[in-house]
Amino acid sequence: MSYRELVAELPREHAEALSDALVELGALSVSVEDADADTPDEQPLFGEPGLVPERTAWQHSRVIALVDATQDPAVLLAAAANEAGLAQTPRFELREVEEQDWVRLTQSQFEPIHIGEKIWVVPSWHDAPQPDALVLELDPGLAFGTGSHPTTRLCMEWLEQTVQPGQTVLDYGCGSGILAILAKKCGAGRVTGIDIDPQAVEAARHNSERNRADVTYGLPDDCPDGEFDIVVANILSNPLKLMASMLASKVKPGGRIALSGVLARQADEVASVYARYIDIAVWREHEGWVCLAGTRRESH
């Protein structure tokens, strides 16, 4: 069976209604994307914590519907637009979707990733390229963090250079658990991973078991009291600013912290918030993203 993708762009306030109508009228699947992705106008979907969502949600959406090649896309879209209450049918383009071995195609897109000196992030269907590598076996899944994003890479490089045997580590916003697992493989003692998403917590636990890494995971309310030798948080700039006092309090005096999920243009603003507690600066930049790192002062 052959398929086509129907692609339409429209204001965000109409995207959800149109996507629902397309599904009701026979589309096989529908996704909504930020039409401004990878441009200066790109925005978080629901807005970062601390900002007004109405001002930061996607302003321009792209609706992509997978349809059977026998369906008339113009008729389908017109009916969906009418069902959604749109004043007119959006303009659209069609993309042919070739038959594929989707499992093989997906696997081909995820090759082993070399990070730092000895780190390799390796999907389960590959072998580590180096016999002496520090290997993290990780498949793409529900939670953020496979090593491909610049912020994850930066944090991993920092951890490889920073973690000392037996140190305690907190990974706040752990996603897939990749940073927590790496910390453990670098010789850390007690390692804790925290995330607001229960699915991420479950994914991280699964990944830790696969990598034989003894890491404790939980939601924010499960975060243990006390301080850590190392804290790493790869989130976004606004949550990092909102949580500055809390995250800084989790670092032992003299301990180290690394922050990422921060664009280079946001670095000074984030650093200024943490400067009250931490001697902090840009540690490294990669593809427009930075990792801020510093040491908690003995008293503040």
Swiss-Prot record:
It is an enzyme of class 2 (transferase). Its main location: cytoplasm. It comes from the Bacteria. One of its GO terms (biological process) is methylation. GO terms for molecular function: protein-lysine N-methyltransferase activity. GO terms for cellular component: cytosol. It catalyses: L-lysyl-[protein] + 3 S-adenosyl-L-methionine = N(6),N(6),N(6)-trimethyl-L-lysyl-[protein] + 3 S-adenosyl-L-homocysteine + 3 H(+). Its EC number is 2.1.1.-. Keywords: Cytoplasm, Methyltransferase, S-adenosyl-L-methionine, Transferase. S-adenosyl-L-methionine binds at residues 152, 173, 195, 234. It is found in: Cytoplasm. Methylates ribosomal protein L11. Belongs to the methyltransferase superfamily. PrmA family. PANTHER family: ELECTRON TRANSFER FLAVOPROTEIN BETA SUBUNIT LYSINE METHYLTRANSFERASE. This is Ribosomal protein L11 methyltransferase. It comes from Burkholderia mallei (strain ATCC 23344). The lineage of its organism: Bacteria, Pseudomonadati, Pseudomonadota, Betaproteobacteria, Burkholderiales. The gene is prmA.
